[in-house]
Design a protein with these regions (language model features):
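Hydrophobic residues on conserved beta-strands that form the core of alpha/beta folds
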Residues: 12, 95-97
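A short acidic/small-residue loop/turn micro-motif
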Residues: 87-89
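Short amphipathic alpha-helix that is part of the acyltransferase structural core
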Residues: 2-59
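Acyl-donor-binding surface of acyltransferase catalytic domains
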Residues: 1-11, 108, 115-171
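A short helix-loop-beta-strand connector motif used in the catalytic cores of GNAT acetyltransferases and
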Residues: 44, 57-72, 78-81
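A short, internal acetyl-CoA/4′-phosphopantetheine-binding micro-motif in the GNAT/acyltransferase core
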Residues: 97-108, 137
Length: 171
């Protein structure tokens, strides 16, 4: 597969959190929601995590307990992937959590690395020492499993997400 990050002009931009889902500046946010739902269906094999745009927008607009922000990777006007970052508003917070989502047809082409670089940059700028992510996988995935360092669950060792995260230094 061609590496999009090397062959196409792609840009990474901060996702604007619009006032409403039908606002003029909502397009990238809405595409992020679409991609999040496509990733859930592809990776988990079901849509029980499906979220409607208004539901996700409410979550992003509520910054009471968590600062939430995101970045999208675009080719021209096409949103190819996004990353959602969550940082606790507790004064002693040291962790940034993230959900990295690349539209399934564009996976494995260098976009994941571009988005992860934004997570790492944001963590450095905020002085956060720990980066944590969550993965989705099919519950019936065959093969060996790895126990994450957090102790939460286990992930399929042969899963593409697991391989990417291990190659990126996650344990």
């Amino acid at each position: 597969m061609t590496d999009l990050a090397e062959t196409d002009v792609v840009t990474v931009q901060r996702i604007v959190v619009p006032e409403t889902a039908d606002a003029a500046d909502a397009r990238v946010f809405l595409e992020m929601v679409r991609i999040a739902n496509a990733v859930c269906l592809e990776d988990a094999g079901h849509d029980y995590l499906h979220e409607e745009p208004d539901e996700m927008l409410g979550f992003w607009q509520d910054q009471t307990d968590w600062t939430q922000l995101g970045f999208a990777v675009l080719r021209a006007d096409e949103v190819l992937g996004a990353v959602k970052l969550m940082i606790s508003n507790e004064s002693d917070a040291s962790t940034i959590e993230f959900d990295l989502m690349v539209d399934p047809p564009h996976r494995g082409r260098g976009l994941e690395e571009l988005l992860l670089a934004e997570v790492e940059r944001e963590a450095r700028e905020r002085g956060l020492a720990t980066i944590q992510t969550w993965t989705l996988h099919r519950p019936d995935a065959a093969g060996p499993r790895l126990q994450p360092s957090t102790g939460w669950g286990a992930v399929p060792a042969d899963d593409a997400q697991t391989k990417f995260q291990l190659a990126s230094g996650f344990t």
